[in-house]
Amino acid sequence: ADPARLAAAVGYDAESLAKLPDGANMGLSCGNPVAIAALREGQTVVDLGSGGGFDVFQAGEKVKASGRVIGVDMTPEMLAKARKNIGQYRQRTGLDNVEFRLGEIECLPVPDNSVDVVLSNCVINLSPDKPKVWREIYRVLKSGGKVSVSDLALLKPLPDTVRDMAAALVGCVASAVLVEETKVLLEKAGFTSIVLTPKPDYVRNMQDWNDPLYKQIAETLPQGEEMADYVVSLSIEARK
């Protein structure tokens, strides 16, 4: 799908998108965790799986000069891309408050109790060890700190044929877990005030746009069923 169109569909406003460094929006969002977080000036924020810096740069504008945003990504290529974008971000916003660190979301390069808000956008579902990810998020958050995550989750288990497809994994689908299971993972990690809000429009949009990846997965589903019967974009909010 077209990155700008997808970003608009999941709730990013045109003004924020216009200020982004070129290429920061890679069309990999399944929600708008920055908006959900209601970020405030001076906060310290970490974005898990920050990619080209899409949510990091937008969060940076919200927390202003007295705040700090740290993007964590496990791929050196993404890290290089994001760091390259910092110069343009500074020019367009006048801010110097973002950084990108190499690391895995199961082992964050961030100190204990140091973060006000943790963001993530369509990344946690890809992790092979989700319980560890949520424990790590809990570890780095300050007491009272907030989780604001958009992720893909399952409404019902995927058929084996779909789960086995490489395309399904790339499309953030094969390793996604059930909505109820997501809540259990957060509870076990120690979170409170957990609010899970399904956003079915995201998957319907992907169907409408004939995204090649989603089309390929959809063609493998049992007859009469569609992606939106199985997969939903989930807004995840919680407190430490």
Go through each PLM region and give its residues:
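Short conserved loop adjoining the S-adenosyl-L-methionine
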Residues: 107-112, 128
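Conserved alpha-helix/loop element of class I SAM-dependent methyltransferases that forms part
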Residues: 2-44, 55-62
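Hydrophobic beta-strand segment of the Class I
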Residues: 45, 118-119
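C-terminal lobe and adjacent flexible extensions of AdoMet/dcAdoMet transferase-like proteins
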Residues: 189-240
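Class I SAM-dependent methyltransferase SAM/SAH-binding core
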Residues: 40-107
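Short, glycine-/aromatic-enriched active-site segment of Class I SAM-dependent methyltransferases
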Residues: 153-173
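Short alpha-helix
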Residues: 174-190
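A short glycine-rich, Lys/Arg-flanked "PGG" loop and its adjoining helix->strand segment in the class I
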Residues: 131-146
